[in-house]
Amino acid sequence: MMTMKVGFIGLGIMGKPMSKNLIKAGYSLVVSDRNPDVIAELLAAGAETATTAKAIAEQCDVIITMLPNSPHVKEVALGENGIIEGAKPGLVVIDMSSIAPLASREISEALKLKGVEMLDAPVSGGEPKAIDGTLSVMVGGDKATFDRYYDLMKAMAGSVVHTGEIGAGNVTKLANQVIVALNIAAMSEALTLATKAGVNPDLVYQAIRGGLAGSTVLDAKAPMVMDRNFKPGFRIDLHIKDLANALDTSHGVGAQLPLTAAVMEMMQALRADGLGTADHSAIACYYEKLAKVEITR
């Protein structure tokens, strides 16, 4: 399967290291992005380049997209000079963006008319796991197609799990993003309490991380907050997008997400304060502002 030609569209914080891991695994890659510096970097790593999604579709067996939101994926897949214009029957699109489940289904249906199969395969783990090739991938779509391209996805991931039909991958990602957002908020709330009460938050973190309150989120984000390092592994702006998709989906299926709605308001307040491009660990800043403290070691 490594003789297949792979297209990769979207070389941002996540897409760039993911594409590099595919090259390291021996895949032949054709890339596209709006940033010429990133394109130059990938060319130096051994990739080829194409100027449009259509051009990539004309020469590739499978295309991976890693883009910010539903409209971007729709434009690349179905728009002018998009994948659909260059696609031949048998092409497979693996969309690893985090988008609305309904959008995944709509794009898939449109591509199917051209004989193109689609998997929705969003990822979790942020930039560090994208670099290490240890992302968690949650995949919706045809199981036989999933099986055929499992090794390709595994070259970028620690785990790759099929969760159901098209759209199921993004429903799973929304569940993931709800848990992550609420965990960061809970951590921020707890460390604000400790700081305001005059207890060293780093010692609190060290004391609780091995118990039931310990989590991947706590270990990843508490040190960032205490070091005042809000360089984005995952931006607040993007998490707002995910929570908006979660709330929209919940309204459509009749589920209630009161805690998600509360954290969404916190994130929107942070964006209004100019922190939209900060890492989502900056949720702590919302609590710090209210309590008039700073969580530091």
Where are these regions (language model features)?
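Rossmann-fold dinucleotide-binding core
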Residues: 11, 99-177
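Beta-strand segments within the central parallel beta-sheet cores of soluble alpha/beta enzyme folds
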Residues: 202-209, 261-265
